[in-house]
Every structure is written in C-alpha cells, then in structure tokens.
Amino acid sequence: MSEFLDFLKHKYAYVAIGEFKPGKFEEAQQLYEEAISTYTHGFQGAYMLREPGTDKGIAVIFWDHIEDMEDNQNEAYQQILEKMSHLFVKPPTTTFYEVSSQIPPSVEKAEE
C-alpha cells in the first residue's frame, strides 16, 4: 500500500531557462553547484543542461513540495544568486512543473 501512496505524491520541478554572457557558463555552473549545495529539506536532485557550443542552459531542480524550495532560500543561497545575476544576458525564464512521470532505467540496461 505504501508504494501506491508514494505514487500519489507528486514531486515538483523548478525549471530555469537562460543564456549567460559569452564565456560565463562555467562560472555560472560553479555558482549553481554552490547554491544547490545549500539545499536540505525536500530537495530531490538537480540537473544543469547546456546547449552544445553555446552559453545557453536549462537548470532543473526537483523538490518534494513547492514550499520546500521557498524554505531553502536562505541567506547563503541569496548571496550566491546575487553573484550569479550579472552573468545572465537577461533574467532567465522560470516555471514550476509537477512531475507527472518518472521512468528509471531497467536493471538490465543499467548493467550494460
């Protein structure tokens, strides 16, 4: 029964899509990883994606609840965001999504 109840609990994904000034992606990535390291309660993982050959990227951060993200926006997190803000060409587009499907790799594929 607990597996069914876990299925009913939805995770949330915070998605930011943006572009950094030329040559600033690596610096932004380092600050992103620093910001992520401050997260605790409700944090379920994160990805930073980069369009090859560009300074465009997508950050995806997974949370148990939307409120968990708000709870994790502490002073250290805010200071890191301030350091990062000047690296963007323009402010990123941000949205919350409800995770509607999650498909882990099969055991056979994971062993290959």
Which residues make up each language-model segment?
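Short S/T/G/P-rich N-terminal loop/turn motif that feeds into the first structured element of a domain
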Residues: 1-57, 62-75, 79, 86-112
